């Protein structure tokens, strides 16, 4: 009985001494989450710590049951100071560990201490899923006049992730933040220059905090249109009136036909054909972008 009491007292004194002794480890920095399969900047976890003094260091990674899955270094002499290690999410047999939470365990031989760091590392290999809820407007014009300058895509993601917008299969926009719902905008420009008129295919993707890149959404078509005409060939008698539809979101457009010029609002443009028969070009311009139609003028019927 006396022996047991002595042993208990010794253990108590040792425990109290450990409480009063400064930790041999400080300045711990451990990545919180990563994906060993993402093939990206976050496909490894960094475990960084600072030792107060030289020692022989063993660091392994343990699972939720406290079992070691990977030994990173073993009985390695260190001179103290900063130590940084990297874990690629694989166990000692080079297999990727199951998803879940892991923690670094540090053994200091000279100190005769083993410390489990209170820094969980989450292994996540499941990619996020993003839904493209809507795209509007479907026709826009990035010409700088403040009217219909951009496309807005609204989305939902099944986990917190950064959303990416692709145009014709190429990534054009990366949304800051990691909201599960929101909107992402495309201004129809390459660098600072507006892109040519035409049909463009828009889709979304998402990359989660761990780095997993999810599949892209089905594509939706949007149209960049600065100005367009309802017809590309117009036939009219000399001096006769004719009309052509002008499509543009500009406040006004400028037209030119032969020696005649003028300003008009988009919509139905009503003009008169030149008095001389021949082939002319009708040019309609909005904010520096033009559309053209051939105007064939024939002799008036007798």
Model-derived regions, located:
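Acidic, glycine-anchored loop motifs typical of Ca2+
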Residues: 32-44, 88-96, 138-150, 190-194, ...
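Short proline/glycine-enriched turn/loop motifs at strand-loop junctions of beta-rich domains
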Residues: 51-56, 156-162, 246-253
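Hydrophobic membrane-insertion alpha-helices, especially the h-region
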Residues: 1-16
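Conserved structural position at the C-terminal beta-strand
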Residues: 106-108, 204-206, 284-286
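Glycine-centered tight-turn motifs at strand-turn-strand junctions
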Residues: 68-97, 170-198, 260-278
């Amino acid at each position: 009985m006396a022996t047991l009491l002595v042993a208990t007292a010794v253990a108590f004194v040792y425990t109290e001494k450990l409480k009063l002794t400064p930790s041999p480890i400080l300045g711990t920095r451990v990545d919180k989450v990563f994906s060993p399969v993402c093939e990206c900047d976050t496909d490894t976890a960094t475990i960084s710590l600072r030792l107060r003094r030289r020692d022989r260091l063993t660091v392994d990674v343990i699972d939720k049951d406290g079992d070691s899955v990977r030994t990173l270094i073993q009985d390695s002499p260190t001179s103290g100071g900063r130590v940084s290690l990297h874990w690629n999410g694989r166990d000692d047999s080079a297999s990727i560990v199951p998803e879940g939470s892991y923690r670094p365990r540090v053994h200091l031989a000279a100190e005769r201490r083993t410390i489990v760091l209170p820094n969980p590392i989450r292994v996540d290999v499941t990619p996020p899923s993003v839904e493209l809820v809507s795209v509007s407007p479907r026709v826009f014009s990035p010409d700088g006049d403040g009217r219909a300058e951009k496309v807005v895509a609204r989305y939902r993601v099944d986990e917190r992730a950064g959303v990416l917008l692709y145009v014709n299969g190429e990534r054009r926009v990366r949304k800051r933040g990691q909201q599960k719902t929101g909107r992402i905008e495309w201004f129809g420009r390459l660098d600072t220059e507006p892109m040519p008129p035409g049909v463009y295919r828009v889709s979304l993707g998402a990359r989660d905090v761990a780095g997993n890149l999810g599949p892209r959404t089905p594509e939706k078509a949007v149209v960049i249109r600065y100005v367009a005409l309802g017809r590309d060939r117009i036939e009219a008698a000399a001096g006769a009136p004719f009309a052509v539809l002008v499509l543009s979101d500009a406040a006004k457009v400028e037209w030119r036909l032969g020696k005649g010029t003028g300003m008009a609002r988009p919509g139905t443009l009503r003009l008169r054909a030149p008095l001389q028969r021949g082939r002319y070009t009708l040019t309609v311009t909005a904010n520096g972008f033009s559309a053209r139609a051939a105007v064939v003028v024939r002799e008036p019927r007798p």
